[in-house]
From Swiss-Prot:
Reactions this protein catalyses: aldehydo-D-ribose 5-phosphate = D-ribulose 5-phosphate
Gene source species: Rhodopseudomonas palustris (strain BisB5)
Name of the protein in question: Ribose-5-phosphate isomerase A
Similarity field: Belongs to the ribose 5-phosphate isomerase family.
GTP-binding among keywords: no
UniProtKB keywords: Isomerase
Catalytic residues (UniProt): E105 (proton acceptor)
Gene name linked to the record: rpiA
């Protein structure tokens, strides 16, 4: 069984939590795309839901699948967000944003009563950091922002390299919000909650890919079946 099959299994398990009348946050990435496609099948079968996409890519996927969409300007609160993750640790802390949608993903997740994270078992780790940590930054003053980010790493006992994410034709990758992303290759993050706080205090940082205290449930699909982990 390949990873795409496992991702789809996790997405199908999360779909069991969806009921008619729900307002849903729709995540971004390969695993979240499986959820959107499966949700579309249910919608065509009569399920009545409305979704808020976390990226323009997800918006296009949802529209193609026939899912009715809205924005957070039009509704107060979401019942549930379903999204993937690049890493999940035993405290349900996450690294997200490998697809570049971390800002909208965090806004939507924070506006939800619950967040279910769907992933294959390879994303489950004891300590975050092997996957590069995305940090969304304003292009202005990038060198100063990078120095401040590196100082924050030192303060939590982490060390590594920052790399500006490449986009098309050799230019910097540009997020849906018009910002850039620097990826931090740290290997290990000793204190993710503290690092999240320090990064959020840097003026040039728009958002970072550490999701702390946001995920309610993680659904992990592996070769031996589905495992569900709830926040303690």
């Amino acid at each position: 069984m390949d990873k795409e099959d496992l991702k789809r299994q996790a997405a199908a398990r999360a779909l069991e939590e969806v009921r008619s009348g729900m307002k849903l946050g729709l995540g971004t990435g390969s695993t979240a795309r499986h959820f959107v496609e499966l949700l579309g099948e249910k919608v065509r079968g009569g399920l009545d839901v409305i979704g808020v996409p976390t990226s323009e890519v997800t918006r296009a996927d949802a529209e193609r699948c026939g899912i009715r969409l809205t924005t957070l300007d039009e509704i107060d609160r979401l019942d549930l967000t379903v999204d993937g993750a690049d890493e999940v640790d035993t405290r349900l802390e996450l690294i997200k944003g490998g697809g570049g949608a971390l800002l909208r993903e965090k806004i939507v997740a924070a506006a939800s009563d619950r967040m279910i994270v769907i992933a294959d078992e390879s994303k489950w780790v004891d300590c975050l950091g092997k996957f590069p940590l995305p940090v969304e930054v304003i292009p202005f003053g990038l060198a100063a922002t990078r120095r401040a980010i590196e100082k924050a790493f030192t303060q939590v006992g982490a060390a590594g390299q920052l790399k500006l994410r490449d986009g098309e034709a050799g230019h910097a990758f540009v997020t849906d919000g018009g910002h850039w992303i620097v990826d931090a290759h740290l290997g290990r993050i000793p204190d993710a909650p503290r690092l999240a706080k320090l990064l959020s205090e840097i003026p040039g940082v728009v958002e970072h890919g550490l999701f702390i205290g946001i995920a309610s449930t993680v659904v992990l699909a592996g070769t031996e079946g589905i495992r569900t982990v709830e926040r303690a």
